[in-house]
Amino acid sequence: MYYWFMPVSQTLHKARELGFEYVELSPTADFHFWHHYPKADDAYIAELNKAQKESGVKIATLNPVFNWSCVDEEERQAQVRNWRRLLEIADQLDVREIVSEFSGDPNTPRRCEHQWYKSIEELTPDFEKYGIQLHMEAHPYDFVELHDPAINLIRGVNKPWIGYEYCAPHTFHLSDGKGDVERMLRSAGDLLKEVHVADVFNHKAFD
C-alpha cells in the first residue's frame, strides 16, 4: 500500500489510523521501483524503522518487480544486483517475506525460464543468508501468466523458502478465463503461502 502524496514512512502512521497492523510495500520511486536499483539509503531505512516503532505497524512484506528473467544477459545481471540490494534492505527492516513476479517476456517463455532459474541459483545464498521467504505470483504479461505453469516452475526450484502467492485480482488471467479458484488454490497445496484479495473482472467473459 502507498499514499502517493505522502512519504512512505507516513503511510505506516496512516495504516495505523485505518486499523491495520501490517502492510506490504509496493514499488515507489524513492524506495524500490520497477526494474531499477533500490534508492533507499541508511537514513531512509532508519526513518522507516522509526515509523514502524512509533506507529506499531510492521512492514510484513515487500513487493519488488525486477526483470530477472530478461533474455539480455547484461540486463539480467543488473536485475540480480537490484535484488541483492533489496534483500539487504529487507533484512535491515526486519522483513522476512517478499512477494514478487516472474517478469520476462511471454514471447520468449523458454529462454526466460532458463534466465529465471539462473537468477534463482545466483540469489539462493542471499535469500538463505537473510532467512527471507520468497512468494512468487504469475502476472499478466510475464513469461508465465497461468497458475499451473507457475506452480511447476516454483516446484522445480525445490527450496523450502520459495512458495506461491495467489493473486485474486488476476484470477481470470491465471485460469485463462475459467475462474476455477478452488481448483487453483487446492492444486497449489503446501506451496501456497500468501493470497492477495480484491475484486476481479473476467476480461474473457464475452470472447
What name fits each language-model region?
Residues V8-A29, I89-E97:
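Catalytic domains of carbohydrate-active enzymes, especially glycoside hydrolases
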Residues P7-T11, A43-L48, H147-I151, G179-R183:
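Alpha-helical scaffolding within the catalytic cores
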Residues G19-Y22, G156-G163, S187-K193:
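Glycine-enriched alpha-helix->loop->beta-strand junction motifs that scaffold or abut catalytic
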Residues W4-F5, H32-K39, E73-E74, F143, ...:
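Gly/Pro-rich active-site loop or hairpin
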Residues M1, V23-L25, I59-P64, I98-S100, ...:
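Hydrophobic faces of well-ordered beta-strands that scaffold small-molecule active sites
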Residues M1-L12, R16, P38-I45, Q79:
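N-terminal-biased segments
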Residues E24-Q52, C70, F102-T108:
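Glycine-rich, proline-tolerant flexible connector loops at the mouths of alpha/beta enzymes
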Residues Q10, A51-S55, W68-Y166, H173:
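Active-site acidic/histidine proton-transfer and metal-coordination neighborhood
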